[in-house]
A protein has these predicted regions:
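Non-ligating segments of multi-cofactor redox enzymes
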Residues: 1-277, 281, 286, 301-343
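Cysteine-rich micro-motifs
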Residues: 288-292
């Protein structure tokens, strides 16, 4: 005879499974809504409503971002998602919508770029400010805290994180992004020459990126939430180069590492974090978006962020956020025992 406790446990498990399925369905509907809004604005023109435009993505991010902040348990990730959602909705969405604020720009874009969206537009003021921030604080300054591409993937796409394909082969596929990044560099130069052919290059690039970008939404349940960031994003390639040569990195304490590979499992970008920890003692790669999942999931706090601020610190403080944040881990044996207890 099944006990009441067992029945309650089974009922709770059924409820959680149904809840996960509902969240996935709603998340995919949110992704589809963003795609339909873009298609309406660019191709089909079914409606003139702002609710069916490129703003559809920002609206969906605002709704699902609020939910993510409410349910996220890790303090660092909760703060990051809150700031990311606020920046996407406010800086990218409301600011350009309410105020047609032009910004200084060179060449073809002079007088056209607006605050917010100018961040991904070459030769604008915010674009150059973004480059500076990436050099000082890493790609995370844009990609993890102020990018609608990531906003979509860390809110609606979060329901499909576990579907992320991680293997040696998919890690090599990261080089695909250099194709679009190469075109982006051509655009970077072309906008300096404001003549008729420049318009063709700009419009074709924008259209091509738009189709691939919004098309990637529809396959997130198959590839995981970071498909665009990992393999296709031309802006990520640009920022990634500065990420590599700049001051940002994730430093590791190899003495603390217990090779549990939780950092690998936590990384949505498919970076073999543990391999870099063992061989180089740090993670300093083009692909790191600085989301901090490897740092916050490390059970022994062996990983920490490093950026320009650490140049002015005598002893860089350890990053909090791991599973054992509130415990004093002075001895390696204690750390291992505490980790085993978490399993």
């Amino acid at each position: 005879m099944v006990s009441k406790d067992a029945m309650k446990l089974h009922s709770k498990q059924d409820f959680e499974e149904r809840k996960i399925k509902i969240i996935k369905i709603l998340s995919y509907l949110g992704l589809t809504y963003a795609v339909v809004g873009w298609l309406n604005e660019v191709l089909f023109h079914w409606s003139n409503s702002v609710l069916l435009s490129h703003y559809s993505e920002y609206i969906a991010i605002g709704i699902f971002g609020t939910y993510r902040v409410m349910v996220e348990k890790n303090p660092y990730t909760r703060k990051r998602i809150a700031v990311l959602t606020a920046m996407v909705v406010g800086f990218w969405g409301l600011l350009p919508y309410l105020f047609s604020l032009g910004e200084p720009a060179l060449g073809y874009f002079s007088g056209k770029a607006t605050w917010g969206r100018g961040l991904h537009t070459p030769m604008t003021l915010t674009f150059f400010l973004a480059l500076l921030l990436v050099v000082l604080f890493g790609r995370r300054a844009v990609c993890s805290w102020n990018c609608p591409c990531v906003g979509t993937r860390d809110t609606m796409g979060d329901a499909f994180r576990q579907k992320s394909i991680k293997s040696e082969a998919t890690w090599k596929l990261r080089h695909l992004k250099w194709l679009l990044t190469g075109v982006y560099f051509i655009l970077f130069i072309a906008v300096l020459f404001p003549f008729s052919k420049t318009r063709i290059i700009v419009d074709n690039f924008s259209g091509m990126v738009g189709v691939i970008y919004f098309g990637s939404f529809l396959v997130i349940p198959i590839t995981g939430n970071r498909n665009w960031c990992r393999w296709l994003c031309p802006y990520g390639g640009t920022f990634g180069i500065l990420n590599k040569v700049g001051l940002y990195k994730i430093k590791a304490d190899r003495e603390k590492c217990i090779s549990c590979e939780k950092c690998n499992k936590g990384c949505d970008m498919g970076i073999p974090v543990r391999d870099f920890v063992e061989t180089k003692g740090q993670v300093n790669v083009v692909d790191c978006v600085g989301c901090g999942r490897c740092v916050t999931t490390c059970p022994v706090n062996a990983l920490r962020f490093y950026d320009v601020r650490d140049r002015f610190r005598k002893i860089p403080p350890p990053e909090k956020g791991g599973l054992l944040d509130d415990e004093e881990l002075d001895e390696k044996g204690v750390r291992i025992k505490a980790f085993i207890a978490e399993l």
